A protein has these predicted regions:
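Domain-level signal for soluble alpha/beta catalytic cores
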Residues: 1-184
Length: 184
């Protein structure tokens, strides 16, 4: 099926991916997000491509960097990264589960962030993060790569709760200040 199609497009349809980036730049985007969303080893393992994640992650960055060079050399490239594994669709994870998953997230995000930093992106963007522990692991791991980190938190409710019940204010309190935008 279409599982991980965006990761595979980085090598199978690189020109199309680059064109999408250039289209965003043409209409005034200052930042483009590399097509890294499905390029983590855990997600690619689900389709038998886990050992090829570095190739796909590099290709995603190369596509965005080429598009920037062709379309607007002053634009920024953010390496978008999804949570390394599918987060359990449950609320109230135990503290032990949160720590175990947080450690796993940290390791995978750190490795991915080092790779994309070496490629020359300007910022790392962990996207679609649903739990505070996962967000903290992602931001801390990506910061180790020496790049600025933006983070995308998914499904923030009007009452300030995150998708699985954590409170956004608790996340903000962890760093004291965090700029944010909303999507999803």
């Amino acid at each position: 099926g279409l599982q991980a199609w965006s990761a595979l497009a980085n090598i199978g349809a690189a020109e199309v991916v680059q064109q999408v980036h250039q289209d965003y730049l043409r209409v005034g985007a200052d930042i483009i997000i590399s097509n890294n969303f499905w390029t983590s080893p855990t997600r690619l393992s689900a389709i038998g491509w886990g050992d090829r994640w570095p190739e796909l992650a590099r290709a995603a960055c190369e596509n965005a960097l080429k598009a920037r060079k062709a379309g607007n050399p002053d634009a920024y490239v953010a390496a978008g990264m999804a949570p390394p594994e599918k987060t359990k669709q449950t609320t109230g994870r135990s503290e032990a589960d949160a720590i175990t998953l947080g450690d796993a997230f940290h390791r995978e995000f750190a490795e991915h962030a080092r790779l994309v930093a070496d490629m020359g992106v300007d910022v790392v963007l962990p996207e679609y993060v649903g739990h505070i522990a996962d967000c903290v692991a992602a931001v801390d791991a990506c910061a180790e790569a020496g790049l600025p980190v933006f983070v995308g938190v998914r499904h923030i409710q009007e009452d300030g709760s995150m998708q699985y019940g954590d409170q956004l204010e608790d996340l903000v309190a962890h760093w004291r200040v965090i700029p944010s935008t909303r999507s999803c």
